[in-house]
Regions:
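Surface-exposed, low-hydrophobicity beta-strand/loop segments enriched in small/polar/acidic residues
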Residues: 2-134
Length: 134
């Protein structure tokens, strides 16, 4: 028989490794491909232009409060557009959690890799957490 020792497991902190996604609880009803902010009450839509943690992975159309969701926090992902977007635009969150071109004072969560012609289009983005637009 094998000996299974769980007590000696070591966890190494590696800031460049690990997964580009995190599993969290929805703190409100959410649509997929929207940006969320982690709060003590779960993942919620941030205030427009404010800091966001990541983007809910594409899946079911809506997520109920208390559901487990997967949130992408870096690398390339897909974010639903709130307006027309050009490739290369720096993107911030709008009041619905959709992406919009960042304006002065807004938190840049991502950069658009593909354009969007209308609200609801899915934009391929690079999640960059670039801080606030100057």
């Amino acid at each position: 028989g094998g000996t299974e020792k769980m007590a000696n497991r070591t966890y190494e902190y590696n800031p460049t490794g690990g997964s580009p996604v995190i599993n969290v609880t929805a703190g409100a009803e959410l649509k997929t491909a929207v940006a969320v902010l982690l709060t003590k009450d779960g993942a919620k839509i941030p205030e427009a232009g404010k800091e966001a943690t990541g983007i809910v992975l594409l899946g079911d159309e809506t997520v109920a409060k208390g559901d487990d969701i997967t949130v992408q926090i870096r690398n390339q992902g897909m974010w639903a557009a709130g307006a027309k977007i050009e490739a290369g635009d720096f993107l911030a969150v709008d009041a619905e959690g959709l992406c919009q071109k960042a304006t002065t004072g807004q938190y840049i969560l991502a950069m658009a890799l593909t354009p969007a012609t209308a609200k609801g289009d899915i934009v391929n983005v690079a999640i960059i957490h670039a801080g606030y637009e100057a």
